[in-house]
Amino acid sequence: MISPSKKRTILSSKNINQKPRAVVKGNELRSPSKRRSQIDTDYALRRSPIKTIQISKAAQFMLYEETAEERNIAVHRHNEIYNNNNSVSNENNPSQVKENLSPAKICPYERAFLREGGRIALKDLSVDEFKGYIQDPLTDETIPLTLPLGDKKISLPSFITPPRNSKISIFFTSKHQGQNPETKISRSTDDVSEKKVVRKLSFHVYEDE
C-alpha cells in the first residue's frame, strides 16, 4: 500500500533580518514583580507583633573578688603540680641518663676501674648456690642433682659403651686402671668428688673378670 503523499515546501533561504516571534506567556507563569514583593514585606513588618524588651536597672554582672583562703588553696595546688612535674625525668634534660647512650659515657668512672684490673675472674658455679632437681613423674619425688665428679676419670669395663654425650663422656674412659694411672675404678657413680655435677647413671659399673 502506498502512503499518501504529503506536500512539502521547497527549501528556501532564510531572511536573517526577520525577527523571531516573541513567546507569549500566560499571567499564571509570570513571576511577581520586585515592587510587589517590597510592598508585601513592608506590610508584613507593620502587622507583625513586636516584643517589647524592658531594660533592667539592676547590675548585669558582678565583679568576683578572691578571698585569702581561696588564694592560698590555688598557690598550694600550683606548687604540688610544679613539684610533680620536676620529679618526672625530663627526656630533653642532657644530665639525665639516656636509654641508647653508650655505657662508656654513662659511667666513665666504672670503666676506668675496670681498666685497672678490678674485674673478677670466671669460675665454676657453686652447686649449693645453684641447685638442680629432677622429679619422678610417677611418684612426684624431687631428687636434687648433687652428684659431682672429681679430677680423675671413671674407668668403664670393655663391655660397657661410654656415654655419647660430649659433656658427660669426658668424665669416663674405657682404659684399664693399670694402663691409665689417672683413672680410678668405680662400681657405681656414688663415690665421686663434690666439685662438679652430672646426671647419675641408671646402672652399676662392674670390673672385667
Swiss-Prot record:
Assigned keywords, A-Z: Cell cycle, Cell division, Mitosis, Phosphoprotein, Repressor, Transcription, Transcription regulation
Tagged with keyword Transcription: yes
Entry's Gene Ontology molecular function annotations: ubiquitin-protein transferase inhibitor activity
Protein's name in the database: APC/C-CDH1 modulator 1
Region (Disordered): 1-38
Sequence positions bearing Phosphothreonine: T161
Assembly, per entry: Interacts with CDH1, BMH1 and BMH2.
Gene behind this protein: ACM1
A single Gene Ontology CC term: cytoplasm
Induction: Expressed very quickly after G1 release, just prior to initiation of DNA replication.
